[in-house]
C-alpha cells in the first residue's frame, strides 16, 4: 500500500523538532525527518523526536541526511580512506534510525 507523507524539510528553515511538531498538529501521520546538523544525531535529541512520534502516533518512513550532497565525493572517489571515514560517520544515522 502506498502511503503519502511529508518531510520536515518542507518547513525549512524551522528547526526539525518544531517542524515535526507542526506536522503532528496538522494530522500528518507519515513523515520523513530531514537531519540538518550533526547535533540532531545526538541520542538525547533523537529520543526527543522518538517521543514526539510516539505521542502523536506518527511513523517516520525515512531519515534524510544533510550530508547527501557530498555522498558522491565521499563514496565514489579514488580515496578509500574518505569512503571509510564517511561510512563510519553514517553509523550516526544508522543509530538514529533504530
Predicted regions and their residues:
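N-terminal pre-domain/capping segments
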Residues: 1-98
Amino acid at each position: 500500500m502506498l502511503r503519502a507523507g511529508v518531510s520536515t524539510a518542507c518547513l525549512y528553515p524551522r528547526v526539525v523538532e518544531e517542524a515535526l511538531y507542526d506536522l503532528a498538529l496538522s494530522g500528518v501521520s507519515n513523515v520523513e525527518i530531514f537531519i540538518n546538523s550533526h547535533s540532531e544525531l545526538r541520542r538525547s535529541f533523537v529520543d526527543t523526536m522518538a517521543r514526539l512520534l510516539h505521542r502523536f502516533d506518527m511513523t517516520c518512513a525515512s531519515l534524510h541526511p544533510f550530508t547527501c550532497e557530498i555522498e558522491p565525493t565521499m563514496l565514489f572517489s579514488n580515496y578509500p580512506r574518505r569512503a571509510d571515514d564517511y561510512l563510519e560517520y553514517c553509523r550516526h544515522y544508522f543509530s538514529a534510525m533504530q
